[in-house]
Amino acid sequence: KDIFPNYKGHRKNDRDKSKIDWDKLFTITNTIKQELIDHFPFKVIEVPKCECDDVVGVLTKYITNNPDYNVQDGLIESNQPILICSSDNDFRQLNYPNVQQFSVHQKGMIERVTDVELLLLEKSIRGEASDGIPNVLSDDDSLINKKRQKSIYQTWIDPILEFRTIPNDIKEKVERNRTLIDFERIPKEISDSIIQSFLESK
């Protein structure tokens, strides 16, 4: 939200319109979280200003690049296998050889991408409606105010993706969206906090 105030801003609007008792739900969630900490052998990570996908993105990279987590199979040492259980397409950018993603909705593994840079460029142009990130042709408040977004036609976006040349009039919005979507752009202080929480959790 420091970068884009409307980021996931629809959540509050949706909660306000919902009949769910959110205070009670949050109380139950906190109770379950504490029970996981107290009684189960799972690491529970909670860091201010962090979304779940930030935690997954940072820790996937950290564990993959840290030899302390490597596994030994005879004489062969390899990276710790990681399985991400989520249907969120943002995790497809975590295209490490040791990482797989299982979609609960599709009941199967999500196909790997062959070009992460191309994936991120297209996502930055198209935006991510579920996260309140509008496409680069639409107003910043399109999603939070439920305004119709301008259409992005394949004939318009194909040359940009093919030549990877971003028109000047959308560069600023592409850059903003990329910062919101790309795990490599998570601020260092947040990444460090996630790793510290991971190392300190039992």
Residue ranges of each PLM-predicted region?
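Extended two-metal-dependent nuclease catalytic cores across DNA- and RNA-processing enzymes
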Residues: 12-201
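Non-catalytic, usually N-terminal nucleic-acid engagement modules in DNA/RNA processing proteins
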Residues: 1-12
